[in-house]
């Protein structure tokens, strides 16, 4: 048995039973763990989806050069999306061969770095353990004919490898590993099976089997290894690999270092004519070089608990063995990949014959960030969007000097997608050919068209005098919308829309909105995130203040027209918190169903006539109010989706402050606080196709007003977004209100069912509204409801019971209540 001395200890080299000593043909191994790179993608322009694909590793028997590997095997992690806000983001996992292999070899044997392989290694360009722990490509030539030759020997006899014919192709029926020390046959789940490239069912020549044995003998895993065949009755050959596992002295320290971006030194070849003294100096020189190397290396990201687990492994095992190092490698790489460091891999172990085990990791340091714009065909073009607009959306973890993390790529996808400027987004990490172990992050963007226009139409039917519709009663309506986005490449936009329910007589209810949005108010390079927005508008809505209570005849409707301008600034403190403040100036006109100005609400008389002596509709008493007021709101929303279910908390506080400018010099303070909490009742496994958790929703809302209060701004109770089971405003209109509610959501197949209970109360303030519309229209001022429902796509179908009258009804609503 050959041996050499390191630190005064004899280190055995592996031996094989073959007579061949040619080690010039070494196979290049690829790490199995690092080959699994997440691939985030979307398949449709609207809904992200998940697929899992696998690409088979290269089976070529020729050792590829590093440049060839980088060209052929460098596969990107693609992050694709669309301009629409995605509610969730999912991964595509591809089994890709990794090019992040270890650095240059460090010597011939079990000295510190093991760069070239322990026990007779030859110092190839890959890290010793990067090769040692990796499945090698199968040596069978897949391009060859599947024909094979029978062994031509009696069945069930053992044949030494050197006794096989060099002219035959042998079909391998099965492979077994036999541990000589334990005198047992190990199962296929054992990590040693990762080392073997031959496969059951494969066809191999004697030379290929000899090459396999030589590779195993020189990998450093085994002190002794042998390969023999056993003939089968069907002419195939069973292969048994018997081995004695390599071991080193016990260790009581563990160290993990990041060797990414470190220049790999090329060792000086040892002259076979060296004297023992020269060899000793040679090994000491290698040890010094390795010590300087690990001293220059950066500490890895591995946390203390994982260090503790590895130390426990070392204490429990005693001597350091190849299997133990594989377990350490698996545990270290599992932590990296669980934490999202998809490009990290263990490439080497050093100091194995000292009291310290050094684990070398290439973590995937980002060396460069590249942003590219592409046309529809994927050609690189000069984009309209200014690059700083994209850069400010990237998390710092995706910049040069940080370790690439899949979560940072996911966050970059979400942030860039929220700009609404791109139809497709890709975040591709690829190996840096100029920096060993480095990662170049490429961000590829396809821009949306800057200008767009849309026309939507709808038809309404107005009954004629006899109650039945006529041809003339069909009214075409709809809206026209246009948008010019990304002005000057700075994400500024101009949007406009015009809406009417009757294109034939648009003057009846024509509404419009023209809005300009100016982000990066403090400059695109300023980290402060403020957006200026201004708009002019004209809208019409039915007022729920003038609504009858239970048992009251139908109350003639009052429409509220608002026309004016608004300007505000929104400052995003974080992704979850924002603050908006601005000025609103508007003219409010109240009209009856004939579009005439109505200064008072109307009532139906017992005689069937209509009385116009109801509560005043405006503060001025003329049916027309003008006012200016400040408006501010702060929102904190940390909700998230868990398999499609909303979980978290949302809080909104809004204040409107009158300035005493306008009709009757209105001065008031109107404030609202809304709090909603979504409580996850059970932990569930997250992922595509997984069931969402049951959720308990708790909701509270308070609104109050001090000072002047026109009736159209009073708080109303009742309706699908107040207290369900009642019509809009059916419970009352008040100066102060309180609402509470609870809802439990239980997932069922592809949807969820829910049960709810809600209550609303005017806190005795209905009488303080001018004209007391609550009393005039015989409303109670408070009410409760309960019920259950099911979500059908975008529609809520629910049965709600009005607790005041004890009657129930079925409702169909769009959207969510909370």
Swiss-Prot record:
One GO CC term, this protein: cytosol
Biased composition (Basic and acidic residues): 57-67
InterPro entries: Bac_surfAg_D15, D15-like, IAP75
Subcellular location as annotated: Plastid, Chloroplast outer membrane
Entry comment describing in which tissues the protein is expressed: Mostly expressed in young and actively dividing photosynthetic tissues and, to a lower extent, in old leaves and roots. Particularly low levels in leaves after etiolation.
Main location: plastid
Induction comment from the UniProt entry of this chain: Up-regulated by CIA2 in leaves.
GO BP term, pick one: intracellular protein transport
Alphabetical list of Pfam families matching this protein: Omp85, POTRA1_3_Toc75, POTRA2_Toc75
Cytoplasmic side: 483-509, 571-578, 703-714, 793-806
Source organism superkingdom: Eukaryota
Keyword check for Transport: yes
Protein family membership: Belongs to the TOC75 family.
Domain commentary: Contains 3 N-terminal periplasmic polypeptide transport-associated (POTRA) domains which may serve as a binding site for the preprotein in the chloroplast intermembrane space, and provide a chaperone-like activity to prevent misfolding or aggregation in the intermembrane space. Transmembrane regions consist mainly of membrane-spanning sided beta-sheets, which are not predicted by sequence analysis tools.
Protein role: Essential protein. Mediates the insertion of proteins targeted to the outer membrane of chloroplasts. Required for the import of protein precursors into chloroplasts. Forms the voltage-dependent preprotein translocation channels (hydrophilic beta barrel) of the TOC complex in the chloroplastic outer membrane.
UniProt name for this protein: Protein TOC75-3, chloroplastic
